[in-house]
């Protein structure tokens, strides 16, 4: 899988939605592996739900999205509702700081940092298996580590 952010260069040079679509279209046509689009505030580029859904429906290999921004759960919920079966991989990001809310919104996984994946894995597995209470219990145990990591 190839994970990519939208094109940007500093605070002032950003593509519009047409340019973003064309960027990912060219990549989709050039590779034969799945593409995950990373929607992160670091880029300063806003990726609308409509644009993400359009790319999932129209571009080969684009069906996974890593959402890491304020209001991730809300955006994940809207993305899943709008995109339906075209959205195969809605993922949580940001070191799993909002993991439970994002799983509740329909995230199918997370892409945390490399610090504690073995501790995060059971949270996701419990939640996806319908054992939310067990997931929340495990998450509560590791949340101090996640908070510590986010402050480094």
Question: Model-flagged regions — what are they?
Answer:
Residues 1-44:
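Active-site beta->alpha loop and helix N-cap motifs at the rims of alpha/beta catalytic domains
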Residues 26, 41-152:
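Catalytic alpha/beta core domains of metabolic enzymes, predominantly
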């Amino acid at each position: 899988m190839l994970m990519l952010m939208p094109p940007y260069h500093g605070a002032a040079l950003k593509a519009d939605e047409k340019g973003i679509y064309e960027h990912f279209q060219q990549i989709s046509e050039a590779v034969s592996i799945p593409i995950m689009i990373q929607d992160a505030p670091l880029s300063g580029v806003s990726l609308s739900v409509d644009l993400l859904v359009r790319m999932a429906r129209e571009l080969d290999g684009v069906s996974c999205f890593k959402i890491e921004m304020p209001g991730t759960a809300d955006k994940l919920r809207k993305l899943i509702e709008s995109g339906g079966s075209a959205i195969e991989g809605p993922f949580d990001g940001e070191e799993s700081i909002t993991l439970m809310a994002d799983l509740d919104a329909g995230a199918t996984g997370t892409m945390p940092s490399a610090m504690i994946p073995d501790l995060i894995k059971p949270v996701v597995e419990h939640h996806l298996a319908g054992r939310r209470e067990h997931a929340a219990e495990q998450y509560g145990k590791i949340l101090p580590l996640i908070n510590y990591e986010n402050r480094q």
